[in-house]
Amino acid sequence: MKVLVMNCGSSSLKYQLIDMENESVLAKGICERIGADGSVLTHKPTGKDKYVVEQAMPDHGVAVQLVLDALQDKEHGVIESADEITAIGHRVLHAGTIYSDATLVTEDVKKVVRDCFDLGPLHNPANLIGIEACEKAMPGKPNVAVFDTAFGMNIPKKAAMYAIPYEYYERYSIRRYGFHGTSHMFVSGETVKLLGKEDAKVIVCHIGNGASISASIGGKCVDTSMGLTPLEGLVMGTRSGDVDPAVLQFICNHEDISVDEMLNILNKKSGLLGISGVSSDFRDVRQAAADGNERAQLAMDTYKYRVAKYIGSYTAAMNGVDAITFTAGVGENAPDLRKDICDYLGYLGVELDEEKNENVHGETTVISTPESKVKVIVLPTNEELAIARETAKLV
């Protein structure tokens, strides 16, 4: 079985073709600047040279067809015909309260995706366009929607609810959903396998430019740091994370700006960028801190402290923890971040093997000592494989 995994953004389309027999990537690539000048497809077949196509892509339909052409190209392709593709798995951001698992795409499913445009205004419209483009390009092929919110949909209601009038939950489905769900599902599941303990209590720290933490027992989510939107939770590259809601009114009144403008500030001008004034990139802020920039150092300290605080909170929520797993761009590649966070966790019996922590090279690595009461792990996320697995289950 071969599964084509699609992740459609407003002007981009990322893809991987995965052979599920051995879970190997046959090819991957990205279409960029869809609907704009300078559209380009970068296609990388495994074991072959990269293939770049500069061609107008006025819409996602054209992009999907170019992807199929590249996959079947005589020199750079990996399949003889699109008939070899069994199904298409799509990353879809939001399903509201309707779906807590991956699902075969039907007209009803597309309506749910459409109805959630206001909950995922940047992603859901593009996700739906990608689904419909694939339906048109490959009629009759099953499409599967794998929702980013699905993993967090099953958290206990006490963890999901905001303490606001209940009618807002009933009327608008306002609750905590969580995001990065496909990554958390994959990493927590792989951690459970690694531990060999079916009911393992796992905290996953997905730390990239966007960042979130989840708590799970036996691979089932019990809490997660992002909320109705990805703005809640950790300090991120440009997002504030947790903030007193009254701050919005205070700044709006004093700066004479609208709520929408204030939300834009919290989403795009806050986080590491907001505190440091240097950059939203962890590496740039870390370097500025090392060079003596006090605001950059404060940004780094706040960033790490928030992670450690959530780990403590989730340890309490699960009445213990067996493993803490770091993943995503920063989590996988910043040994100093991992060390500084683990320095907060001595009360849990966490002991880091500093040599192992400094020598992680893109593979799953246990970086705690054998004596550590909690395993600390670095585990590369693989959202595409997770989507392919969910797709394969349904077709």
Label every PLM stretch briefly:
Residues 70-85, 191-196, 311-322:
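Phosphate/pyrophosphate-binding loops at sites that engage ATP/ADP/AMP, CoA/4′-phosphopantetheine
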Residues 12-57, 227:
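Short glycine-rich, Thr/Ser-proximal phosphate-binding strand/loop in the N-terminal lobe
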Residues 71-123, 144, 150-159:
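Short beta-strand-loop/turn "lid" adjacent to the catalytic site in phosphate-handling enzymes
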Residues 297, 301-322, 331-395:
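Internal helix-turn-beta structural module
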Residues 151-254:
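Glycine-rich phosphate-binding loop of actin/hexokinase-like ATP-binding domains
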Residues 264, 271-275, 282-317:
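Adenine-nucleotide phosphate-binding core of ATP-dependent small-molecule kinases
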Residues 217, 223-258, 264, 328-359:
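Catalytic phosphate/nucleotide-handling subdomain of diverse soluble enzymes
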Residues 1-4:
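Extreme N-terminal starter segment of soluble prokaryotic enzymes
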